A protein has these predicted regions:
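TM-lumen/periplasm interface segments of multi-pass membrane proteins
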Residues: 15-93, 323-343
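Membrane-interfacial loop-to-transmembrane alpha-helix junctions, especially the N-terminal start
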Residues: 24-28, 253-264, 306-314
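Alpha-helical transmembrane segments and terminal signal-anchor/GPI-anchor hydrophobic tails
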Residues: 45, 50-54, 65, 72, ...
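Transmembrane-helix motifs of polytopic, lipid-linked glycan transferases
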Residues: 91-107
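Transmembrane-helix signature of polytopic, membrane-embedded enzymes
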Residues: 104-121
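Short acidic/glycine- and proline-prone juxtamembrane loop motifs at membrane-interface regions
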Residues: 128-134
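Membrane-interface transmembrane helices that cradle and orient dolichyl/undecaprenyl
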Residues: 140-153
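Membrane-interface alpha helices of multi-pass inner-membrane proteins
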Residues: 154-178, 194, 268-272
């Protein structure tokens, strides 16, 4: 019931944001505060909460654990100044959500819609569990502007810094390649991925991972190697949109627009190959996050008489996905909601 009320309030806030420029700023501020408080004041929420809490309690300079250095030393600093684990959760919630908000403000043609997608497509809730990775992605996304400006050294340094929180962020180094506008190249990549939706290539990929690899344990864990039915269901709409944009590719005439289109096509191809296998899906997060920028961009480009139909169909898809993943499946332990305020 909490998350039903939550998404209802979000809808009201974001709809009111359409009415007036001042109301837009106020609504977005309220939205940001609300998502920070819900994420930051959570308690025992998410499948990894207890694990991260145990790591935090036992973390010391003598026991540095297996964590990436960025996340490790930030937490050591928090412990040094006497912060509880719950306080660290709140601080990371601020950092993650503010950085995602700034990213959306910079690149989205409709900030309210992108924020709604941030929730409905589960990225907000994913950050309850994959804390390190989502902090890294949030930092990385705010450095993409340097790739647009061809300041590749700065882009490289920010990517490396982001990867100090989760090494999978290094795959984001591919982003500058997506500035190459070759329709046929992306079409071939996408078409080549289609057979993997039904072919069991995922198990072969997992078995090729060497045991010496730092994250090899993730590729042998049942949880990470099982197929997510929600992720498979989610393949339908993105693949339909790839067909649509490959036909209308010429309307995306700006450099930033083409980059987000290209990243989206690549992320869909990656998702097709992953076919819902959790560990492979996580590798795709750094690309797949592009969809919260991409969908509003596409809606803004289609013809006026088609816009209401496409918009309502997308809204229905996003709501169904939210209901299925959060309200029904619990989004990996975020349901029911518990807060440190009610201990």
């Amino acid at each position: 019931m909490f998350y039903v009320c939550f998404i209802g309030i979000v809808f009201c806030i974001l709809i009111s944001a359409k009415l007036d420029a001042l109301l837009l700023r106020v609504s977005l501020f309220i939205f940001l505060i609300m998502i920070i408080l819900i994420a930051g004041l959570r308690y025992q929420i998410g499948t990894d909460y207890a694990t991260y809490r145990e790591i935090y309690i036992n973390l010391s300079f003598d026991n540095l654990s297996y964590l990436e250095p960025g996340y490790r030393y930030v937490n050591l600093f928090f412990k040094y100044i006497g912060l509880s684990y719950e306080a660290s959760v709140f601080i990371f919630a601020i950092i993650t959500n503010v950085l995602f908000y700034l990213f959306i403000r910079r690149y989205s043609v409709s900030v309210p819609v992108s924020l709604l997608l941030y929730l409905c497509l589960n990225y907000y809730f994913i950050a309850f569990n994959t804390v390190r990775q989502m902090i890294g992605i949030a930092i990385f996304l705010n450095g993409i502007d340097y790739a647009f400006k061809k300041k590749y050294l700065y882009f490289f340094l920010i990517t490396v810094f982001a990867a100090l929180f989760h090494y999978t962020i290094f795959i984001g180094m591919l982003y500058p390649i997506f500035k190459i506008n070759r329709k046929r190249m992306y079409m071939i990549i996408w078409l080549a991925s289609i057979p993997f939706i039904v072919l069991p290539i995922q198990n072969i990929i997992i078995k090729l991972i060497p045991a010496s690899f730092k994250y090899a344990s993730y590729f042998t864990s049942f949880f990470f190697t099982k197929t997510s039915s929600a992720a498979v269901f989610k393949l339908i709409v993105p693949n339909m949109f790839v067909i649509l944009i490959l036909y209308y590719i010429s309307v995306f005439d700006k450099t930033t627009e083409r980059l987000w289109v290209n990243v989206f096509i690549f992320s869909v191809a990656f998702a097709n190959i992953a076919h819902g296998v959790n560990v492979l899906i996580r590798l795709n997060y750094v690309f797949q996050i592009s969809e919260i920028i991409f969908y509003p961009l596409v809606v803004s480009k289609i013809q006026k008489f088609q816009k209401p139909i496409v918009s309502w169909l997308l809204l229905g898809y996003f709501v169904v996905f939210y209901i299925f993943t959060v309200l029904v499946q619990g989004a990996q332990g975020v349901v029911p909601y518990q807060s440190v305020l009610f201990l």
